């Protein structure tokens, strides 16, 4: 676990984006932890979040030409991350996002920002069932570019409908590389540095049941 990943867990806890307790997920599973990106709701939060995404991208070996955020949630993520890549790593990365409604006047089209061309890295908060990724890939393909990978904040490392995680299914079915700032294993390692053994046990039990 790298230092920026430890710092990201601290950041999530401090902002209230990561909570522990009993949370019923869309899947019906009762999880001992919950990640809510809606808690990143200030300029400072967004600036910090962009830096973490940028650092994770820089720590990967993925080569891409344009960073793409899917409306609406992906718009602040792609904006903050490209600023952080420029300011922190001197990487002037083109970015774009889509419109929900195609504009027929002015510059027109369904894309705002840089033209989608070459290899595209999609940015999202989490991958739940993969619907957003399918939509993003459709937009990218329609604009003549190629989806290369996806970066998310948290990989729950949790089974989807089968024995694989949704992220594993995305990687296998679409040939995409999926990056994350942290995953569940990182979170468990972080918590083991503390003294809340009961919480660790609850997460381990949940992981034994639903983890991959």
From Swiss-Prot:
Catalysis performed (reactions): orotidine 5'-phosphate + diphosphate = orotate + 5-phospho-alpha-D-ribose 1-diphosphate
Keywords, alphabetical = Glycosyltransferase, Magnesium, Pyrimidine biosynthesis, Transferase
Transmembrane feature ranges: none
The EC number(s) attached to this protein equal: 2.4.2.10
**Looking at the keywords, is Magnesium present?**
yes
Q: Which GO terms describe its cellular component?
A: cytoplasm
Q: Where does 5-phospho-alpha-D-ribose 1-diphosphate bind?
A: 26, 72-73, 99-100, 103, 105, 124-132
Biological process, per Gene Ontology: 'de novo' pyrimidine nucleobase biosynthetic process; 'de novo' UMP biosynthetic process; pyrimidine ribonucleoside biosynthetic process
- Cofactor (UniProt): Mg(2+)
Where orotate binds, per the record, is at 34-35, 128, 156
The similarity annotation says:
Belongs to the purine/pyrimidine phosphoribosyltransferase family. PyrE subfamily.
Matching entries from PANTHER family are given as:
OROTATE PHOSPHORIBOSYLTRANSFERASE 1-RELATED (PTHR46683:SF1)
Subunit organization:
Homodimer.
Role according to the record: Catalyzes the transfer of a ribosyl phosphate group from 5-phosphoribose 1-diphosphate to orotate, leading to the formation of orotidine monophosphate (OMP).
Q: Which HAMAP family match?
A: PyrE (MF_01208)
State the protein's name.
Answer: Orotate phosphoribosyltransferase
Q: Which organism is it from?
A: Ruthia magnifica subsp. Calyptogena magnifica
